[in-house]
Amino acid sequence: MVRPRSGIVLVLCAPSGTGKTTLTRRLLEEFPRFAFSVSYTTRQPRAGEEHGREYNFVDEETFIRLRDEGFFAEWAEVHGNFYGTPLEDTRQLLARGRDVLFDIDVQGAAQLRGSLKQGCYVFILPPSGAELERRLRARGTDPEDTIRRRLANARRELQQAHWFNAWIVNDNLEQAYDELRAAYLAATLSPTCRPELVDELLQDWR
């Protein structure tokens, strides 16, 4: 009898305005096997948030101690607050066969690549710089300096896209989702998800 596969890490990175949130939401709706490990943060809880549900809220001293002990699979400082994903919690989810989705920046993805091996790294690309700028302006929510900063960040992120497993251009939402879905399903067939499969089949060969 073939044992179920272990879980995989699916890491999605994209510049702001590329449509990653919409694609992520659709993937989670279709595949309930995905799970999230609860991250740690030093920021203050917002209204309605609970410790252990949205985040594990800790002070900066505790976070830095955990970071230095190698507790996090990845961590980052964002707007003066620290955020980190617990490594052991993620490993336990994977061992139970749950797939873990990360929606993080390129720096966090690079850290994950070093700490978690069975990962699929997908970069969502805009059709062009001009189209990305059009989308950001169409939101009507960001001031000019924020738009310029997001465009500059997008350029820097694109310069690091070469090491990802898959590139998906979100020019058409349906096509982009089909490609993301295909990349995810292909990753679940990797031998790293069932490293013992062939040896077990050979042992039971008749």
Swiss-Prot record:
Residues 7-185 form the Guanylate kinase-like domain. It catalyses: GMP + ATP = GDP + ADP. SUPFAM superfamilies: P-loop containing nucleoside triphosphate hydrolases. Its EC number is 2.7.4.8. It comes from the Bacteria. GO terms for molecular function: ATP binding; guanylate kinase activity. Keywords: ATP-binding, Cytoplasm, Kinase, Nucleotide-binding, Transferase. It is found in: Cytoplasm. One of its GO terms (cellular component) is cytosol. Pfam families: Guanylate_kin. ATP binds at residues 14-21. SMART domains: GuKc. Its main location: cytoplasm. Essential for recycling GMP and indirectly, cGMP. Belongs to the guanylate kinase family. HAMAP family: Guanylate_kinase (MF_00328). NCBIfam families: guanyl_kin (TIGR03263). This is Guanylate kinase. It comes from Oleidesulfovibrio alaskensis (strain ATCC BAA-1058 / DSM 17464 / G20). The gene is gmk.
